Amino acid sequence: MKVLIASGAGGGTAKKSIGKYFHLQEFGKALEKLGVEYKLVRETEYVTGFPSKNVKGWISKKKFHSLIKEYKPDIVFCDCQSHFALETIKLGIPCFTYLRGNRWMEVEWAKKTIYKDPLMKTVLEMRQKIAERVFSECQGIFMTADYLDKVIKEHIPNAKTFHFLEGLDASRWYPEEGMELKHPCVGMCQDANWWGKTKEMLTLDQVIKQMPDVHFYWAGDGQYKKPILEILEKYDNFHYLGTLDYPDGVRKYLTEIDIYALPTGMDTTPLSCREAMAMKKPIIGTKVGGIPEMIYDNKSGFLVEEGNYKAWINNIRLFLDDKELSKKIGDGARKLLLEKFNWDVVAKKFVVVAESHLAHKN
């Protein structure tokens, strides 16, 4: 079986969003262990279509068709619901897509915030129509958190959904010196790409204010960076690092922080949190979306309710004061990662689904 993997999802705290491409490569290698041939490409290098900034791509699909003709994939796996997936479907090639978050909620927040302009709203709606068609006509949707199943079925009732808890090669995540931070410290490593998710970072306003002896670091970027920095940068114990080199810069950062924090208004099973788990970091995260599927309260981290800054303060102080507890929770986080977020397990599940579809097709 030959699988063509198309990487197109944006976002992420690594420069140029390389993190998502990097981990799809790990997925491909796990497929190879099972005797499956794979090819990983960046979808925008082959097809973009309208609407996009690449005007030439609106018309020409030559590179895409050449790729398909030369590689002859049995299955195409896309992590973005855009033109690559759509053109694959048009050619009648079995296509599976991967959903990392609540796309519909992200779109609604975008309309309320950065896409208020009529033109940009139109662009957003056009992109969403393409995504809806991909969701409706593809052979199945792999989802990164169980809670997304209900979300998907609300919008695409007949969709075939499959659990796909994105893996992580824990061997790549080991202590590496090289970054100097002030201690004690709490580290965040997340993007600010839609307000429904990002606004929860403002809960830390009172946390940072009331914990002047603790330093707070944020690595990440995104269109909502400015309103966050306007509030948090007034504190001397808050430090913004921007984007980090991947994976080395992120690994050095996670090595140095004392606690990993995930304040979020909506998320699934974020990559940076899995990386922190691999590094045995004690974790505190907001109890929303798919976060409880990776942070088991009092076992692999602590969960707090949205807006509850007092819980943040109490849990941070608890971790800092009780080193034995911090180590226990950190060890529990890595153990859970190895058991649940394993590429070999994910690859086997994918192959079962793909082969079942091909057998039924033939």
Feature roles, as predicted:
Residues 4, 178-199, 205-209, 217:
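Conserved donor-binding/catalytic core segment of Leloir-type glycosyltransferases
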Residues 47-50, 96-129, 182:
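Acceptor-binding helix/loop patch of EC 2.4 sugar-transfer enzymes
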Residues 62, 66, 119-141:
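Membrane-proximal helix-turn-helix segments that form the acceptor-binding/catalytic region
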Residues 265:
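Aromatic "clamp/platform" in nucleotide-sugar-dependent glycosyltransferases that forms part
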Residues 311, 318, 325-340, 346-352:
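A short, well-ordered alpha-helix in the C-terminal region of glycosyltransferases
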